[in-house]
């Protein structure tokens, strides 16, 4: 299985090139790039007001207001410090870098810029991990509508944090492959007792969401992660956040890969069958043609 990159490579490569050219004393060049990411996220890299010595990285998330309610602004301020500026119109967060005043730790700055989406997501997880560490119960469940028709729920208890993703399968084939995929997660936990518990429910929401307006339907699935203190403590939580916030994309990416692999195998098998049929086809009988005098025609 393939782990999706947590960081955004386009941001990192673009900034790294800009920093490298600036450090070498090269003349700065204009940049204007707009690109998308999973979950409807949109990025924009540009020179504000046409100033080529400044590079702005902006991100747009449809659900950013929900993340703000869980401390996203504070977390970003802590991580990015003076690089965080007022967002440009149409975007939620903007980072500004001055090529004439390069930071000392360029590699670290570039990497953190590439983690912008992850760091926006991180606030809700850090908040509920902290609730669990402090033994708080009864806190309101976090509800993040991270896609138009899909939702993430986060809830903390004294001994665990429960994260539930709702997801929509486009067709029946996706449901079948998704179930097989989730069964592999259950089997994997038997091999590693430190892995979190993973549950999958189809059509109906899990018991944790019985009192909510969670969607119900034949194409609806719910994936539940039960995270224990060994997954949420200060040492492990960064890696946990890196992995869990991309899980929905990870699942659907592998469903698409599985379907593509199956189609490739089917086409290859069909090609093999056609070769067998062609070999089994009887050769057409050649008729001997003669002239009126009895001579045989010969092909040249």
Curated annotation (Swiss-Prot):
Keyword terms: Acetylation, Actin-binding, Cell projection, Cytoplasm, Cytoskeleton, Nucleus, Synapse, Synaptosome
Tissue specificity remark: Expressed in hippocampal neurons (at protein level).
Gene Ontology biological process: actin filament polymerization; Arp2/3 complex-mediated actin nucleation; positive regulation of actin filament polymerization; positive regulation of lamellipodium assembly; positive regulation of substrate adhesion-dependent cell spreading
Molecular function via GO: actin filament binding; structural constituent of cytoskeleton
PANTHER family: ACTIN-RELATED PROTEIN 2_3 COMPLEX SUBUNIT 2 (PTHR12058:SF0), ARP2/3 COMPLEX 34 KDA SUBUNIT (PTHR12058)
Family statement drawn from the similarity comment of this UniProt entry: Belongs to the ARPC2 family.
General function of this protein: Actin-binding component of the Arp2/3 complex, a multiprotein complex that mediates actin polymerization upon stimulation by nucleation-promoting factor (NPF). The Arp2/3 complex mediates the formation of branched actin networks in the cytoplasm, providing the force for cell motility. Seems to contact the mother actin filament. In addition to its role in the cytoplasmic cytoskeleton, the Arp2/3 complex also promotes actin polymerization in the nucleus, thereby regulating gene transcription and repair of damaged DNA.
Full protein name: Actin-related protein 2/3 complex subunit 2
Organism in which the protein naturally occurs: Mus musculus
